[in-house]
UniProtKB/Swiss-Prot annotation:
Provenance organism: Homo sapiens
Pfam families: TPR_10, TPR_12, TPR_2, TPR_8
Site location (Interaction with the 5'-triphosphate group of PPP-RNA): 288
Record's protein name: Interferon-induced protein with tetratricopeptide repeats 5
Stretches for region Interaction with the 5'-triphosphate group of PPP-RNA: 254-260
């Protein structure tokens, strides 16, 4: 096959609907963690589409440079199509064939790649698709939604759109409704702007109605009911689920989360340990265990007014060590798990291990391709570490400002603005020409809509540092709006 034909083939490949054309970037995930998770779901989560999981696993194998393993996964996907989707075999094969074509293309087996694009073209022609190599069908949109969801928070809105598109065609399809409900639940959970979001409550109820035997979707409904202060109703679902299952780690982990948030830490730990026996490499489970040990530690410290002694002090030290162990395990198993970094760093600080805390915070600050919410949280926690443990007020101010610049609407906003006002005012009492504090107050008052006060502080800062572009820009904006 000539170069021209290779270029032509590439143009056809780009038309296909499959994982290789859905803009799923490997920089946004920990490949080993996602591969591990998919493997666990294939083994233990019987309610999820095995076809979608094998197709996704093939793509992950390709991203790891394991194209032969990717082909084996696609063979597994084909077997599932024949076993479970024989009534729609050709339509359900389109994503798998697209992945085959791309893998063979990357292996320079161009004739094999062309064979699969030909199969796709024949189906599109047979079903009168307006596109030569693309067929609009809800099953493909659903599979796209699952793939996007697996690649993390940056993809949730696109996943939601994919499931919505599928539901337009089949509004009562059980699988489409599960995918949509879980995606909206994830969006509720990731949208941290103060109030509890409950957009997923309706979709979750519908998904449970359409899938009455699905424990996995029920546990999400229980957690959302807990979010909206209907904990008793949520617990009924949890109890019902636990009566029905024995060792489904993906259900146990969320049931444990329910009990952890209810402050029933021993019950949560019991379920987490049970799940961890089955899936010992789960970063989620390790993180949840760390959160339970941390909560128990906080309870003792509160009861002793932050001065535990004797047995209480020994127990606190033991809980800190346990929390560190599990947060560290979570971070090591998923290098993109931002909250595992901040929780581990904070726990090191709690135990007086400041150099270890500093090291983990610096690793967190170097994380790329994470959401703005995660960046916001990292800067906030590092600022607190600098303020209260390192006693470095200027570094704390810098990171509090960075947190607000990344995301100025969140539950942390009031804490951040209060901390900035307190620290900056204190520093100005000692040095009225402290330009960092002046500009920080200007930024905070501008954020709060106090434009005249903001302008006054920026003017003072600009007099000290007249070439600073940030101060000049802020002043111009303020003067034009006053």
């Amino acid at each position: 096959m000539s170069e021209i034909r290779k270029d032509t083939l590439k143009a056809i490949l780009l038309e296909l609907e499959c994982h290789f054309t859905w803009n799923l970037l490997k920089e946004d995930i920990d490949l080993f963690e996602v591969e591990d998770t998919i493997g666990q779901q294939l083994e233990f989560l019987t309610t999820k589409s095995r076809l979608a999981l094998y197709n996704l696993l093939a793509y992950v194998k390709h991203l790891k440079g394991q194209n032969k393993d990717a082909l084996e996964c696609l063979e597994q996907a084909e077997e599932i199509i024949q076993q479970e989707h024989s009534d729609k075999e050709e339509v359900r094969s389109l994503v798998t064939w697209g992945n085959y074509a791309w893998v063979y293309y990357h292996m320079d087996q161009l004739e094999e790649a062309q064979k699969y694009t030909g199969k796709i073209g024949n189906v599109c022609k047979k079903l009168s698709s307006p596109s030569n190599y693309k067929l609009e069908c809800p099953e493909t949109d659903c599979e796209k939604g699952w793939a996007l969801l697996k690649f993390g928070g940056k993809y949730y809105q696109k996943a939601k759109a994919a499931f919505e598109k599928a539901l337009e065609v089949e509004p009562d399809n059980p699988e489409f409704n599960i995918g949509y409900a879980i995606t909206v639940y994830r969006l509720d959970d990731s949208d941290r702007e103060g109030s509890v979001k409950s957009f997923s409550l309706g979709p979750l109820r519908k998904a449970v109605t359409l899938n009455p035997d699905n424990s996995y979707i029920k546990v999400f409904l229980a957690l959302k009911l807990q979010d909206v202060h209907a904990e008793a109703e949520g617990e009924k679902y949890i109890e019902e689920i636990l009566d029905q299952i024995s060792s489904q780690p993906y259900v146990l982990r969320y049931a444990a989360k329910f009990y952890r948030r209810k402050n029933s830490w021993n019950k949560a730990l019991e379920l987490l340990k049970k799940a961890l026996e089955v899936t010992p490499t789960s970063s989620f489970l390790h993180h949840q265990m760390g959160l339970c040990y941390r909560a128990q530690m906080i309870q003792i410290k509160k009861a002793t007014h932050n001065r535990p002694k004797g047995k209480d002090k020994l127990k606190v030290d033991e809980l800190i060590s346990s929390a560190i162990f599990h947060f560290k395990a979570a971070m090591e198993r998923d290098s993109m798990f931002a909250f595992a970094y901040t929780d581990l760093a904070n726990m090191y600080a709690e135990g007086g291990q400041y150099s270890n805390a500093e090291d983990i915070f610096r690793k967190a600050l170097r994380l790329e391709n994470i959401t703005d919410d995660h960046k916001h949280q990292i800067h906030y926690h590092y600022g607190r570490f600098q303020e209260f443990h390192r006693k470095s007020e200027n570094t704390a101010i810098h990171h509090y400002l960075e947190a607000l610049k990344v995301k100025d609407r969140s539950p942390l906003r009031t804490k951040l603005t209060s901390a900035l006002k307190k620290l900056s005012t204190k520093r100005l009492c000692h040095n009225a020409l402290d330009v960092q504090s002046l500009s920080a107050l200007g930024f905070v008052y501008k954020l709060e809509g106090e434009k005249r006060q903001a302008a006054e502080y920026y003017e003072k800062a600009q007099k000290i540092d007249p070439e600073n572009a940030e101060f000049l820009t802020a002043l111009c904006e303020l003067r034009l709006s006053i």
